[in-house]
């Protein structure tokens, strides 16, 4: 459900239309996601908490010994063992407090950054499509999030639309998953759009750290809340095997605009 968290929640609300006092029970390890915080803050929500210690009698002895020894009295243990909803996830590179909102200043350069999904099936990742800008003061701005789950033709058309809508200078796309295909998709929609392919030659942690540092240094802002992007930024851990689409697009976009991306080629 975490992959489709807001969709799952929204659909669940539609099932509560009958009866005099419909209610629902939501149980989860409280990851610091925007939607979970919204639910907790809702005045109609009654919050109860349980801890791993409440359930020790039902857990395997070796599990109890290993998990409690490893996580007891740690910040990760506050979430995983004590069931606390933390403001920030321990070990995450991004923090909620570093994300600020303001109107965009005059922009010096704009790009549409794409992290293409490998497949377009129902359970596939979305294709991350972010519009990134750097203003005349040298600050980075997230201008739009047009990420979607769809076919190459669908995300190609959306990316080109965003390029024209925001008067971008170029489209930047990760080429590790089919560089020639990406170029073909975009050029089929509009042959005049400049495309820059970028290749991941180092690990994501190494690529992500400089962009996360821009946020910590107050050199970044969002023109409005982007809940899905912000959840990915603030819950991704460097050892996480998953590859969040919006986060990747964010890294590629601002590496291009503010950090001088390497290992890339114009086509």
Where are these predicted regions, by residue range?
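ATPase catalytic-site recognition across NTP-hydrolyzing enzymes
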Residues: 56-117
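Catalytic phosphate/metal-binding cores of nucleic-acid and nucleotide-processing enzymes, i.e., regions
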Residues: 10-11, 17-24, 82, 87, ...
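Conserved Walker B
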Residues: 1-2, 117
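ASCE P-loop NTPase helicase motor core
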Residues: 3-71
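An active-site-proximal beta-strand-loop segment
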Residues: 114-127
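Mg2+-dependent endonuclease catalytic cores in nucleic-acid-processing enzymes, primarily RNase H-like
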Residues: 111, 128-239
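Conserved RecA-like P-loop NTPase helicase motor core
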Residues: 245-248
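Acidic two-metal-ion nuclease catalytic site recognized across multiple nuclease folds
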Residues: 253-267
